[in-house]
A protein has these predicted regions:
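Domain-level recognition of soluble alpha/beta enzyme cores
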Residues: 138-173
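Active-site-proximal alpha-helix that buttresses catalytic centers in soluble enzyme cores
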Residues: 15-101, 141-144, 192-193, 198
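A glycine-rich beta-strand to alpha-helix segment
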Residues: 118-135
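Hydrophobic packing residues within well-ordered alpha-helices of enzyme cores
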Residues: 78-82, 106, 133-134
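Extreme N-terminus of proteins, especially the signal/transit-peptide cleavage junction
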Residues: 6-18
Length: 198
């Protein structure tokens, strides 16, 4: 497993809207006798779906400043495909601590590792933790199959304040599943709005 990198220093606070994309890794192969769960790779279907997801995000001009991923092979592979498909040059962190982590650990990683001059972060993780955070922030029960991406916006002044509290709840903007926009279901257009690139 890779070692946990040093925590980045924080810059001055910003009032800009923060965008957080939470993704469950794409479909992975079953565990083989000679390998551990940590080493499981994506299936061909998982690779294809991730590439479709990257294309959808890219077509909407989504901007990503930082990628935070579990250090497991299937999450790193998912993050690699998203970065390549979106032609990203974002900062990248693969963290052992996020392997099968609970929801609060993903939330803490967003708060602890994002820099204040960054406006968007993309997080790739596992269930039940990543689904738990998506449902907690969305304040509703949602199905989170593999390769689901939930796009949230936060008006928090700093990344440290992004976590959900009684006075602050990140807003669910869009849900992508199977490489396509699954929510909201817009009756007037086939192309629901996603946060645009600044």
């Amino acid at each position: 497993m890779t070692s946990v990198p040093n925590r980045p220093r924080r810059s001055n606070g910003s009032n800009a809207i923060k965008t957080i994309l939470l993704m469950r890794h794409a479909k992975a192969a079953a565990e083989e006798p000679h390998e551990s769960d940590f080493q499981r790779c994506l299936t061909e279907d998982g690779i294809r779906t991730t590439c479709e997801t990257a294309a959808t995000l890219l077509s909407h001009g989504i901007r990503i400043d930082r990628i935070i991923s579990s250090a497991a092979e299937r999450t790193r592979q998912t993050a690699d495909l998203i970065a390549a498909g979106m032609q990203l040059t974002a900062a990248r962190m693969d963290l052992d601590e996020l392997y099968l982590a609970p929801a609060k650990k993903f939330e803490r990683a967003i708060c602890d590792y994002s820099l204040e001059d960054e406006s968007s972060v993309f997080v790739v993780g596992h269930n039940p933790g990543i689904a738990g955070l998506i449902c907690d922030w969305a304040d509703q029960s949602l199905s989170v199959p593999t390769a689901t991406v939930a796009v949230f916006e936060s008006s928090a002044d700093t990344w440290h304040d992004v976590r959900r509290t009684k006075v602050h709840i990140p807003k669910l903007v869009c849900l992508l599943q199977h490489g396509k926009v699954a929510w909201p279901h817009d009756q007037t257009t086939s192309d629901p709005e996603l946060p645009e690139k600044s």
